[in-house]
Amino acid sequence: VWARGQVVVSLKAPNTESIVEYSKTHEKALVDFFVKVEMNRAIEQLQKEYSMVVMDNLKSDLNVMLNAPANFTYYKDTTDFFWSSNNANTGRMDLIVYTFPYTDPNTFTEEYLVAKRDSVLKANLPGSFPGSYMQTETRAGVEYTPITLNGKYCGVMRGLWRMQGDMMGGPFVSHTRLDEKNHRVVVAEGFVYAPETDKRNFMRRIEAALFTLRLPGEFEEPVTETLDIPKEKK
């Protein structure tokens, strides 16, 4: 008997050694599969309950849609830049969406997007102290991975952020898409500040919101993460 919505993977092999070998060979794929299952559950929940503040402002000002968690009620909206947060004392999650013209064929590269991120955040997210601002912590390395969402390219960037001139920092993840109709690049990013606790669940929740980003022409499309099941060992 399984719980509703529970996902079970059965491994069948002629002997224990084969199962161990298969599990070691496909360890990352198996973990990724279950992570994506959890991501789809979070996406499904966000499609049922989400922040109307974020949805309405993004649709009217940037002409995009995104289902942020319902407790994202604090926001700042400027030209081509939107910020929202749950403003929590513990487990703070923030969301930003910004756009810029698509003019450079090297846009979808780690180097370009890190530089663009730093310039945009320096201008739009000042810290609490004079002269402080958010930057990418490049010393820890940044991971850039191209994926396909609903048949279209999306650049996923993961890394750490830090507040220049302050002691704050934490993880971030961003999705970068090309809005072909409007010849612009759209970046949606979530970041977490939770020095007192594990950040994994907060990051997964904010990343689920990024998967709900819809550009003009996609507003009616369903959103899910593609589930890649490891192939059978021959």
For every predicted segment, state its role.
Residues Q6, D61-N63, P69-N71, F81, ...:
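Extracellular structured ligand-interaction cores
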Residues V1-A13, E17, A123-N182, T197, ...:
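Signature of long, low-cysteine stretches enriched in small and polar/charged residues
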Residues Q47-K76, L213:
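N-terminal "mature-domain start" segment
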Residues E21-E44, L66, F72, V185-K234:
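Surface-exposed amphipathic alpha-helical segments
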Residues V1-K59:
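Long, acidic/polar, low-complexity amphipathic helices and coiled-coil-like
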Residues P69-S128:
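Secretory pathway targeting signatures of secreted, lumenal, and periplasmic proteins
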